[in-house]
Amino acid sequence: MDRPAYRRVVVKLSGEYLAGSQPFGIDQPTIDRIAGDLAEARALGVEIAVVVGGGNIFRGVEVSSRGVSRPTGDTMGMLATVMNCLALEAALERRGQSARALSSFVMPEVCELFTRRAAHKYLAEDRIVLLAGGTGNPYFTTDTTAVLRAAEIGAQAVLKATNVDGVYSSDPKKDPSAKRFERLSHSQALEGGYKVMDATAFALARETALPIIVFSIAEPGSIGAILKGTGRGTIVAS
């Protein structure tokens, strides 16, 4: 077995991906497959925390034009991430992989409040920790949440799972001449304006010297492949 490149990571999953081929909601085969990938990656000996978006259920930015304030809309979106984390927690537990959802919001009947101490405890117990509720504040994306939580819990990298196998000079689905980058600095990612993550996430990663690996989650086993250094993706690092 190839030795994993990292001891502790945060995996960032988009909520939209959990919908599968559906326009919204949670596609059970998709979330079960992702749970399997995460469990296999954990079996490599890597401590894993996961941040999930909520776009498959609700997008706060979109309702701001319909009379709902941006802070309220963002809060609704953050609550959608709690639902996704609970669904993923259940999928992991069905596979025999212990997991624990921690929320930025106080909701004791639903899941425990996120603290660094709690996250460290559950990671040390071989659980996959699911980080729900975004940052708990409006105007911040779940990409930024992933970098923030990674810095807080001492993760060595953020694994940004997307539907493309890295960062490209332009949209490869529209531009056949688009160039895929093997490696970028945080500053190059910011200056290039690449849409794979928002500027706040890249800026925080640069400040905390945290590597981000952008890869495609479309192929089963891709998370484990990235951890073993055999996967295809773009490394964004200082």
Swiss-Prot record:
GO cellular component entries = cytosol
**Entry EC number(s):** 2.7.4.22
Residues reported in the UniProt entry to bind ATP: K12, L13, S14, G15, G55, R59, T162, N163, Y168, D171
Activity regulation remarks:
Inhibited by UTP.
Q: Supply the SUPFAM superfamilies for this chain.
A: Carbamate kinase-like (SSF53633)
Which residues hold UMP?
A: G54, D74, T135, G136, N137, P138, Y139, F140, T141, T142
Record localization: Cytoplasm
Q: Which InterPro entries match?
A: AceGlu_kinase-like_sf, Asp/Glu/Uridylate_kinase, Uridylate_kinase, Uridylate_kinase_bac
PANTHER family, alphabetized: URIDYLATE KINASE, URIDYLATE KINASE PUMPKIN, CHLOROPLASTIC
Family membership noted in the UniProt record: Belongs to the UMP kinase family.
Question: Its quaternary structure?
Answer: Homohexamer.
Please give the name of this protein. Uridylate kinase
Native organism: Nitrobacter winogradskyi (strain ATCC 25391 / DSM 10237 / CIP 104748 / NCIMB 11846 / Nb-255)
Tell me the organism's taxonomic lineage. Answer: Bacteria, Pseudomonadati, Pseudomonadota, Alphaproteobacteria, Hyphomicrobiales
